[in-house]
UniProtKB/Swiss-Prot annotation:
Keywords assigned by UniProt, alphabetized: ATP-binding, Cell membrane, Ion transport, Membrane, Nucleotide-binding, Potassium, Potassium transport, Transmembrane, Transmembrane helix, Transport
Assembly with partners or alone: The system is composed of three essential subunits: KdpA, KdpB and KdpC.
Transmembrane keyword on record: yes
Protein name: Potassium-transporting ATPase KdpC subunit
Entry-linked Pfam families: KdpC
Disulfide bonds: none
Species whose genome carries this gene: Clostridium kluyveri (strain ATCC 8527 / DSM 555 / NBRC 12016 / NCIMB 10680 / K1)
Length: 210
């Protein structure tokens, strides 16, 4: 029996030490460092207006008001549901993801055509072939808050009409919320739709400017 306990003593101690280091000390240290150095990012990059969180700079939203810029479609409604959706079965408990339909799938063809029709109605000066692809395709997570600069640009004229703001003002707002390539090399330039709409709302006086 003593031999048995001697045999398991070392692996037991190793397991205990790794549990304390990896399961307790490491997470606590990283959490502490992140809260000190990157507090905003560590807490979800929340966008605060007048003391209230209205969203996250990392999560897209479905903007239906004609005065605001539109983002990419989402197969999971940006993980935003009401109780009626859950009761009716429209909420499947999926927080992120996409339908992963084949290009010829009738459901995908229908959804894309509906999005094209809606976009052309809201942007009558734009031709179908000029609609950037990312405005018609959902991201892999369904939560992407960004669109391409081209997708932002094609919406400017419609926003001029719906908001009363000048074209130059809207282009400046878009420019101020455009993020360059990571390290100047990786990825593409992106525009944060939530931040653009936040600045538009400020210009329209929809809440107090701070």
């Amino acid at each position: 029996m003593s031999t048995f306990f001697k045999g398991i003593k070392k692996p037991f101690l190793v397991t205990l030490v790794l549990l304390l280091v990896c399961g307790l000390a490491y997470p606590l240290i990283l959490t502490g460092i992140s809260q000190v150095i990157f507090p905003k990012q560590a807490n979800g990059s929340l966008v605060i207006v007048n003391g209230k969180a209205i969203g996250s700079a990392l999560i897209g939203q479905d903007f239906t008001d004609g005065r605001f810029m539109k983002g990419r479609p989402s197969a999971v409604n940006y993980n935003t549901y009401i109780r009626e959706d859950k009761d009716s079965g429209n909420y499947a408990g999926v927080g992120s993801g996409s339908k992963n339909y084949a290009p010829t799938n009738p459901e995908l063809v229908k959804r894309v055509q509906e999005d094209i029709d809606a976009f052309l109605k809201a942007n009558p000066s734009i031709k179908k072939e000029d609609i950037p692809t990312d405005l018609l395709t959902a991201s892999g997570s369904g939560l992407d808050p960004h669109i391409s600069p081209e997708s932002a640009a094609v919406q400017i004229l419609a926003l001029v009409k719906s908001t009363g703001l000048s074209k130059d003002k809207l282009e400046t707002i878009v420019k101020n919320n455009t993020q360059g390539k990571a390290f100047g090399v990786f990825g593409e330039k992106t525009v944060n739709v939530l931040k653009v709409n936040l600045d538009i709302a400020k210009e329209l006086g929809l809440f107090n400017k701070k």
